[in-house]
Structures are given as C-alpha cells and as structure tokens.
Amino acid sequence: NCMALCEHVLAMAISDGWDNFFNNLQQIRYKDGIIGMRTRNHYTMADWLPENSWILEDVSRKVGGEYTKSVTRTISHKKFFTSKGIKDMRYVLPDREITIEYVPLDALEEVEKNIRPGDIVALIYTNKTDVFSAHMLIIAEKNNKKYIREANSKKATTFDTPYKEWASNIQDLEDYLGLSFMRVKEELDVPGKVILPWEISKLKSKARSGSK
C-alpha cells in the first residue's frame, strides 16, 4: 500500500544490504522498532512523521510559503484500536489534539519549484475529524520533469503521473484539502549515505533534544 511504498523506499535509501534494510524498515514502521499492532505508526501525520523525525522533517511551510494553511483534529488511538477488535489498551496513547500544516490544492502548481525529488507527501482529508491523511505519495523526477509516484495495491505495483497533470486532476475533488510535505533531513540526504540500525538511537535522541 501507499505507506508501505514510502517505508520501503526510505529504508532502502539508507541501507547497504538486506539485513540493514529489514532492521531499518522495522525502525521506520514501528515505534522504537518494536513490532506490534499497537506500536505500528498507523497515522501518517500523528504517528509516522513524529516517530521518524530522526530522518524526516515537515517541510510543508518551506514548500507552501505564503499559501500554507493549518488544520487541527483530535486523533484517538483508543477509538482506532477498538474498531479493530483490540481490547488490550496498554501502551496505547491517549487522545491527542494535533495541528498540522498543508499546501492547499489550488496552490500546488504555484509551489512546484519548491518541491524536491524524494519528498514524501500526505494527501489531507477535508471533512474527517479523526484522521488527517488519506494517501501517501512520493515525488519523483525523470528527464527534469516532476512526477507523483503512487502505489497500486490491487496490481501490487506503482505508477507515475506528471505532477502538473496530477495537481490539475485533483483540483475539483472536495474530499481533500491539500498536501503535507516531508523531506529527508539535509545532513542525511547524501548520495550513498548508509545509516546502520544501531546509529538510529543516537539520531532519535538528537531529534528529541532538538540538537543538530
């Protein structure tokens, strides 16, 4: 699915072999790398991005500039897990009111120049009160032209759409507000950069302390 695509691409980009890939994938996909339904980073903007702040940063405002807007919603893990038939609520986070930033759909063509290949994108719902992200995508570039890369779960593959075409096609869809943008941190966005699994704890500590 869309989140799995982004997780796999991110993990492969920082790994030098399959062993490191699977370890890094585990760190990206689960809180503190602990495999489990309740430790999975289910919510893109409330879980996945914050838990991966050691490698990613929210660049929605950098991309959107003056067009950037914000939206606040309450995220309930308890409600989510209850809907999945899970009764054991140990280690489940309490309900949280979270505010995120996004670039409105009608500004997407204006901000294309600020988007980089490799940016991870979340498509934000309009009317949902308990979730932000409807879909995750990746910005790709071929022959100096930007594309939106998406996962097709039914066909178990990916497909690319020219960015301008994608942005134009989505303008009239009232279900969505806009896009939030995530980007690999500058100091880690180095060709051939490998992050070993045991280095991640230091990067997480650095991210939590706010140090550079």
What are the residue ranges of the model-derived segments?
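Acidic/His-rich structured neighborhood in mature extracellular/periplasmic domains
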Residues: 1-98, 116, 123, 144-145, ...
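Generic preference for flexible, low-structure residues
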Residues: 22, 41, 59, 137, ...
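Generic detector of well-ordered alpha-helical segments enriched in charged/polar residues
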Residues: 22-26, 90, 109-112, 167, ...
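Short alpha-helix capping/helix-loop boundary micro-motifs
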Residues: 100-111
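Low-complexity, Gly/Ser/Thr/Pro-rich intrinsically disordered linker/tail segments
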Residues: 117-120, 140-156, 160-212
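Short, surface-exposed coil-to-beta transition loops
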Residues: 131-136
